[in-house]
């Protein structure tokens, strides 16, 4: 199995392909990407037969920006007979996966695939039963075993394969299912909520998104991102010349500062979170974020980088490399992750977490 399917946002196939070609090459796994415009997925075909499995084992999925999900697959199954689609699929997976922990029958996230998605949901139940009988799936769902993927690209036409549950997206089609809160001031609130789900392990939420923390929201108006922080009972400085939603101000948890987010300097030294979703050139935002991190003004940050029309992967890579270089220059250890989230459009969301030193007394430990 030498092919890896990567699901992505439709229209960003070239960026996804450029990224996987670059990062697979750094792992000395060579191949080429098959790209179809607006398909919502990319296929990376490795030159060596076993390299597909090697790639999804060795390259951290968390290091990918434009892929929502990935899995290794075999050859395309075509012309599945409508009266029995199950037998050929089971045949393709036998000997490839044994006692898988979960089945996901998926499609690309395109308008054309919506009808196909309805079929996939109905088809999952009988297929799961057949795969369990064949030993491809375990008799119960478990996160400790590989995930079995059946990926339909057209009616009667699918790829079959698997991903490793410790190195994939835990979400179906790589998309967290979030509901827009009726009392949120703007739909942008879902970007930050999704970022929390993608970047912060669920078992660390109570510690890292704790009650009573102090946070700053740069470019906050009307308060979509502030809403998420308030919902987690944080105290928030919302920085923007534009007005904040009255519903947020009424909570008593928000201090509205009518200032430019680029000029604001915090007066507290116990700020846990800084978030930022400003419409500005990505290099300018990256420089501001680096300044906050280098000065120890916050412990963690989530921010958006708006993408240019061309060379998007190169631009994001350059911005992330700049932040990393600034941190390295000042001897600061940090973890950087970036992802084009489902709720992002022409942008990517970045999470940076400073890793505290064991030696006390430094400003960045306050």
Swiss-Prot record:
Chief place where the protein resides: cytoplasm
Alphabetized GO MF terms: S-adenosylmethionine-dependent methyltransferase activity
Family: Belongs to the class I-like SAM-binding methyltransferase superfamily. RNA methyltransferase RlmE family. RlmM subfamily.
Protein's organism: Escherichia fergusonii (strain ATCC 35469 / DSM 13698 / CCUG 18766 / IAM 14443 / JCM 21226 / LMG 7866 / NBRC 102419 / NCTC 12128 / CDC 0568-73)
Cellular component terms (Gene Ontology): cytoplasm
Complex formation: Monomer.
Pfam families reported in the protein's UniProt record: FtsJ, RlmM_FDX, RLMM_N
Reactions mediated catalytically: cytidine(2498) in 23S rRNA + S-adenosyl-L-methionine = 2'-O-methylcytidine(2498) in 23S rRNA + S-adenosyl-L-homocysteine + H(+)
Membrane-spanning parts: none
Descriptive protein name: Ribosomal RNA large subunit methyltransferase M
Enzymatic class: transferase
Keywords assigned by UniProt, alphabetized: Cytoplasm, Methyltransferase, rRNA processing, S-adenosyl-L-methionine, Transferase
Binding site for S-adenosyl-L-methionine: 188, 221-224, 240, 260, 277
Physiological role: Catalyzes the 2'-O-methylation at nucleotide C2498 in 23S rRNA.
EC number: 2.1.1.186
Entry's localization field: Cytoplasm
